Every structure is written in C-alpha cells, then in structure tokens.
C-alpha cells in the first residue's frame, strides 16, 4: 500500500464537443447541427474559471473534440470568435486561466509538433489517452484513434519536455495481451523521454444511445488485474491513476494505483456526465486509512526539473509547498 494517494482539484471546461472522430462508446461528441453542439466563448468560460479558483482549484482542464476545424460549421463559429485555428483560441484561453490563477492542462486530441510548441509555454502539463495499441471496431470511424498517430504525439510531447498524462481504456474490445502491449509502449516512451507523469487505467462504461450501449463493462477483477499489471510494467516514477467517480478506488490502490486524478468541486465530468465527482471528504473515506495528498497538475519531480515556462513560475511558487505538492491553505 502506498504511504499516500494524490489528487488534484480542477475545473473542467468542455470548450467544444464537435469532433472528427466517431468512437463507439462516446457521448461527449455532437454533430455540428445537433442542438447540444457547442463552442464555448471566452465570456462563458471566464466565470467558470473564476468560480473554480475561488473554490481552491489549481488546474484548468481544457477539453476539445479533435480537429473540429475539419467541420465547416465549426470553423464559422470559430471565426465569429475572432480565430482561424483552435490552437490560437486555446492559447488565449490558457492565458486567461493563468491570469485568473489556474494552471492550464489541455487535452485537445491529436496535435502536431508546431501546435504543441505553441501550447507548451502556456500549459503546465498536457494529455492524450493512448487508449490501446490494438486496432478495434470501436475506433473504426475515428482517424485520430489510430495507435501510431497517438504514439507519435506522445513521443513528440516527450521530445518537447511537456509533462504528460496518458492512459488506457479497459473493456472496449481489447485483450489482456493488448493491454500489456499498450502499457509496455507507454513505459518505453517514458524511459526514452521521462515526461509521463501518470497513466490512467480507465474502465469503459456503456452509455445509452451509443453503438456500444450493450457492451459489458470490465469486471472489478479485470480492473484490479490491469492496475497490478500497469504497476509492474511502468517505471516507478510514473503514477497509476484511477477514476474514483467510475470505480471504488480502494482495491485498485491495493493493487498499485497511487493517484485519483482531477476532482472538480464546481464542474461535472463532461466525458462521463452520469458519474458525479466525490468531494474531498468522500475521497478520504474511500481510501480509508491512507493519507490523501493534494498535488498540482504537474508532479513534484517535474517541478524540480524545471519543466515549466516563466509564464507559470509565479503560480508554481505560490501554490506549492517545499516538497512540490499543493500548499495547504491557512
């Protein structure tokens, strides 16, 4: 059992749910003509960030559908906001978050090297789920879920020294050997570049009105087994993360998990909207006798390495304690 388990406090901003991919399990994505399709404006986003900062959050999690620019209707909406590319808009949203006092973490799907270089100075960390190295039916209509494409981006982030979150999705048609291959791929990338902070072991949850609505989720035993395999395969400086709003974490902590990810006191989980976040008191009850320790969206080892830009130095100095974790409020 670990001495302590970590989490971060975030505000979850679903900037757009328009996406070029059509994954078999996703309820986040909307077609451009759907009444729930959106591109949030800065005036909508600012008060959400401000509420999060007042609630003690340290992370602004910006989530996007992938390459929405491929959808003409989205481009028109983006141009109304005064931008020609999503990355330009993300950069300004990150600046806004920093101004308010939050550390940006962007997960926008596939980004090329130039786009990562633009966002690196304005993000404390970034993320992209590998999901799996297997070619699956669930991803047959999702060009951005091609394993080689995702691996290339994770490697590019390593070359640029961007602290990074990735992970696998368990139960979408992959085999146990596929999971091992995926985890070994992540481990090899980290051994080369040293940038992967955490690997999420996320359990598939069937959603109504999706092609995989009747697909069974992984059992608790499968999840325990996968976490144990992850802890065995991954280097010791890479945390194994599980989502406490999707599964009871205690047995997974016993198997090797040590992080509970981002928890929001002010926003919902827009990817799994049916799964409410536990609050910090509930989190502590879930993990029983283990110490719960709050971290930032950058891990202490990457703070010590100085893997962040001058744009973020003041917030790092303000928010961290001497060990690189979240400074306790007095």
Curated annotation (Swiss-Prot):
Enzyme superclass (EC):
lyase
State any single GO MF term.
Answer: 4 iron, 4 sulfur cluster binding
Q: Which UniProt keywords apply?
A: 4Fe-4S, Iron, Iron-sulfur, Lyase, Metal-binding, S-adenosyl-L-methionine
What positions does the domain Radical SAM core occupy?
A: 5-245
CDD domains per the UniProt record, alphabetical: Radical_SAM (cd01335)
How it assembles, according to the record, is: Consists of two subunits, CofG and CofH.
Q: What is the lineage of its organism?
A: Archaea, Methanobacteriati, Methanobacteriota, Stenosarchaea group, Methanomicrobia
This protein's pathway reads: Cofactor biosynthesis; coenzyme F0 biosynthesis
What InterPro entries does the database record attribute to this sequence? Answer: Aldolase_TIM, CofG_family, Elp3/MiaA/NifB-like_rSAM, F420, rSAM
| Role, per record | Catalyzes the radical-mediated synthesis of 7,8-didemethyl-8-hydroxy-5-deazariboflavin from 5-amino-5-(4-hydroxybenzyl)-6-(D-ribitylimino)-5,6-dihydrouracil.
> Where along the chain is [4Fe-4S] cluster bound?
19, 23, 26
Query: What is the originating organism of this protein?
Result: Methanococcoides burtonii (strain DSM 6242 / NBRC 107633 / OCM 468 / ACE-M)
Source species, domain of life: Archaea
Q: What is this protein called?
A: 7,8-didemethyl-8-hydroxy-5-deazariboflavin synthase
SUPFAM superfamilies in the record, alphabetically?
Radical SAM enzymes
UniProt cofactor note: Binds 1 [4Fe-4S] cluster. The cluster is coordinated with 3 cysteines and an exchangeable S-adenosyl-L-methionine.
Instruction: Report the sequence similarity comment from the record.
Output: Belongs to the radical SAM superfamily. CofG family.
Q: What is its EC number?
A: 4.3.1.32
Q: Which reaction does it catalyse?
A: 5-amino-5-(4-hydroxybenzyl)-6-(D-ribitylimino)-5,6-dihydrouracil + S-adenosyl-L-methionine = 7,8-didemethyl-8-hydroxy-5-deazariboflavin + 5'-deoxyadenosine + L-methionine + NH4(+) + H(+)
Coiled-coil segments: none
Q: In the UniProt record, does the keyword Metal-binding occur?
A: yes
Cofactor(s) in the UniProt record: [4Fe-4S] cluster
């Amino acid at each position: 059992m670990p001495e302590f388990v970590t989490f971060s406090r975030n505000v979850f901003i679903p900037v757009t749910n328009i996406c070029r991919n059509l994954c078999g399990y996703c309820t986040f994505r909307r077609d451009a003509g759907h009444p729930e399709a959106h591109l949030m404006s800065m005036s909508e986003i600012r008060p959400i960030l401000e509420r999060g900062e007042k609630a003690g959050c340290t992370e602004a999690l910006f989530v996007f559908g992938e390459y929405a620019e491929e959808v003409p209707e989205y481009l028109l909406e983006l141009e109304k906001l005064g931008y020609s590319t999503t990355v330009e808009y993300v950069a300004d949203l990150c600046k806004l978050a920093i101004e308010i006092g939050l550390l940006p973490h962007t997960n926008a799907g596939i980004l090329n090297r130039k786009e990562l270089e633009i966002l690196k100075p304005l993000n404390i960390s970034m993320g992209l789920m590998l999901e799996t190295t297997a070619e699956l039916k669930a991803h047959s209509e999702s060009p951005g879920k091609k394993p080689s494409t995702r691996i290339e981006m994770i490697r590019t982030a390593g070359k640029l020294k961007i602290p990074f979150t990735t992970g696998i999705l368990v139960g979408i048609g992959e085999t146990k050997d596929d999971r091992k291959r995926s985890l070994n791929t992540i481990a090899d990338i980290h051994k080369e570049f040293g940038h992967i902070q955490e690997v999420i072991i996320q359990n598939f949850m069937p959603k109504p009105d999706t092609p995989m609505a009747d697909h069974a989720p992984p059992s608790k035993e499968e999840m325990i087994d996968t976490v144990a395999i992850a802890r065995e395969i991954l280097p010791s400086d890479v945390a194994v993360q599980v989502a406490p709003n999707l599964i009871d974490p205690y047995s997974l902590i016993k198997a090797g998990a040590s992080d509970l990810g981002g928890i929001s006191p002010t926003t919902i989980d827009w990817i799994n909207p049916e799964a409410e976040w536990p609050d910090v008191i509930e989190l502590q009850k879930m993990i029983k006798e283990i110490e719960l320790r709050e971290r930032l969206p950058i891990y202490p080892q990457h703070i010590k390495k100085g893997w962040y830009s001058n744009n973020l130095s003041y917030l790092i100095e303000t928010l961290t304690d001497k060990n690189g974790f979240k400074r306790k409020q007095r």
